[in-house]
Regions:
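Bilobed "Venus flytrap"/periplasmic-binding protein-like clamshell domains
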Residues: 1-22, 32, 78-132, 136, ...
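Beta->alpha turn/N-cap motifs
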Residues: 10-13, 33-34, 45-62, 67-69, ...
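Alpha-to-beta junction loops
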Residues: 26, 42-51, 118, 134-141
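Short, hydrophobic alpha-helical packing/hinge segments within bilobed ligand-binding/sensory domains
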Residues: 37-40, 128-130
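Hydrophobic/proline-rich hinge and linker segments of small-molecule sensing/allosteric domains
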Residues: 69-88, 172-188
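Pocket-lining segment of extracytoplasmic ligand-binding domains
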Residues: 124-216
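Secondary-structure end/capping motifs
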Residues: 189-253
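Long, low-complexity C-terminal extensions of enzymes
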Residues: 244, 251-268
Length: 268
């Protein structure tokens, strides 16, 4: 029976699985947005996936992560973006439409607002910028939609919203990277050494041909090759010590009585 691997259907994950499919029938690929794959992993419907960092933190009693994989940035992320009609410091009491695709980005926004003493109502809605901004004071988008909207800077009803990058905002508050996702599995279902080895090989290959990956992803995501290459080269894929420190800080700001010693990682 093949191992079921959850693949987030966003461009920033492409370097981790580029050319992975040709390696045979040992792996079944399951594509989805983070919220879908999070649910499937916890239900035992997939074996290993990139899981949103907040879900890894919340479900630390059930999950174990690979020790050397992450989706993280030090500073701007370019694809977790808040579009807003007035400056962020004036959003106290605002209604902010938030994407339903990722719990981590919504929690990150909540943490950042609280860090600035801002109390806003976060309203989960379908991720469509125009409808979000017509009915709310601000809108949180993630992934390829956020990247495209931030690049194009189109108007909504004749007005152009302000744009804030949450990765950059996190760095300004903490001086740490932000880890958006880690590879994780259920504690009682470790991934095979073969699968982990293939993932490491795929990452090395993808990062080694990053321009090729950017050329492949560019037309799919409707952005130029230079924009896509800059975007992909910005990510930290190895879950180094600063990325772990950022994850722990996020846990401390998000979860009461959080103890980082409860986080578990598979052997290297």
């Amino acid at each position: 029976m093949p191992e079921r691997l959850g693949i987030v259907s966003y461009a920033n994950v492409a370097p981790l699985h580029y050319r992975l499919e040709p390696w045979g029938d040992e792996i079944e690929f399951v594509y989805g947005v983070p919220s879908e794959l999070n649910r499937m992993l916890l239900a035992g419907e997939i074996d290993l996936t990139l899981i949103s960092s907040i879900e890894f933190l919340r479900w630390r009693d059930r999950l174990t992560a690979l020790p050397d994989f992450s989706i993280a940035t030090l500073g701007p992320v370019y694809s977790v973006m808040l579009f807003h009609w007035r400056p962020v410091d004036e959003l106290d009491g605002a209604r902010i439409a938030v994407t339903t695709e990722s719990a981590t980005s919504v929690q990150l926004l909540r943490v950042l607002l609280e860090g600035r003493g801002i109390n806003a109502e976060l309203v989960p809605v379908a991720p469509d910028l125009e409808s979000m901004l017509r009915e709310h004071d601000a809108a949180l988008l993630i992934g390829d939609k956020a990247l495209v909207e931030a690049v194009n800077r189109r108007t909504v009803d004749g007005r152009q919203p302000l744009v804030s990058d949450l990765g950059e905002a996190w760095y300004r508050q903490t001086r740490l990277p932000f880890t958006f996702a880690v590879w994780a599995s259920l504690k009682d279902n470790p991934p095979s050494r073969t699968l982990v080895g293939k993932l490491r090989e795929a990452r090395e290959h993808g990062l080694g041909v990053l321009h090729e990956v950017a050329c492949h992803e560019s037309p799919i995501r409707s952005v130029s090759v230079p924009v896509m290459q800059r975007y992909l080269s910005n990510f930290r894929y190895y879950f180094e010590l600063p990325d772990r420190d950022g994850l722990i800080e996020f846990g401390r700001r998000s979860i009461p009585d959080f103890d980082p010693e409860e986080l578990r990682y598979w052997p290297q």
